[in-house]
C-alpha cells in the first residue's frame, strides 16, 4: 500500500509541475530597488537634512546610505519646478547606467554618476545619484536636486551594488 501512495504523489507532482511552472513564469520577478525617504536628522555643520537611501533586495538585509537632496534652505520649495534647488519630487524613477566621471566633469559630482529618469510628468530634469564632496563642509553642501551621498566609500559601495544587483528603480517618498 505505501508504494502506491508514493506513486500517486509522484504522479500528482509530475502533472502539477508544468502548471506551476507556467504560473511562476507569468508572475513578475521581484527585483532590487532603491527607496529615498526623509529622516529627522541633519548635518551638524551645515544643517542640511539627511535623507535615507535604502537598497532593498529580496533575500538580503536592507542597506542604508546617508544622503542629501536639494539645499538645506530649499527643502519646502516646489519639487516639480526646475531651478528651485529643492529635493527630488516624490515618485518612481528609472536608473541609468553607473558611469565613472573624469577630470573634465564637475568636481561637485564626485567620481560616479547614476542618471535618474522620472516615470511621471515633472519640470525637473538632469537628475542623478552622485557623491556630494562638500556635504557638511561649506556653502556648496547639498545638491541642486540630485541625490548626493555624504561619504565617498558609500558612493563606491552603492555603485558596485547597483551594478551587481541590476537595480533599475528608485522610489522617492514624501
Please place each PLM-identified region on the residue numbering:
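Bacterial N-terminal signal peptides that target proteins for export
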Residues: 1-7
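Bacterial N-terminal signal peptides
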Residues: 7-15
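Sequence contexts marking disulfide-bonded cysteines in secreted/extracellular proteins
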Residues: 19, 145-147
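Cell wall/extracellular polymer interaction/catalysis modules
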Residues: 20-141, 153-154, 166-168
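Low-complexity, intrinsically disordered Gly/Pro/Thr-rich segments
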Residues: 148-161
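A short beta-strand-loop micro-motif that forms or neighbors metal/cofactor-
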Residues: 160-174
